[in-house]
Regions:
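Motif-centric detector for short Cys/His coordination patterns
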Residues: 1-89
């Protein structure tokens, strides 16, 4: 029986103000534009461009994270990346 497979984030780069380019383990690359987001609660520090730019890949969780223990669930990131793919160069 084949289990459901969710690709994980293996690369991340800030390519604009609150815009991430994410690379997933299945080769999917997508640009995610968070510029219209107004983060609240524990995510509020992400409103600051300098804090947002400190994004790192959390290999243990398979997603992206920021200082202060902030991370985003990988499932919606993957769905957004598939909806906004970057063509291979």
């Amino acid at each position: 029986m084949e289990e459901d497979y969710l690709p994980v984030v293996v690369g991340a780069a800030v390519i604009g103000d609150h815009v991430l380019r994410l690379l997933f383990s299945d080769g999917t690359v997508g640009d995610l534009d968070f510029s219209s987001e107004r983060w609240t609660g524990v995510l509020e520090p992400l409103n600051d461009s300098a804090h947002f730019a400190q994004v790192e890949v959390d290999r243990g969780a398979g997603t992206v994270g920021w200082p202060g223990g902030i991370d985003l669930a990988p499932e919606p990131l993957y769905e957004q990346a598939k909806a906004h793919p970057v063509a291979a160069a």
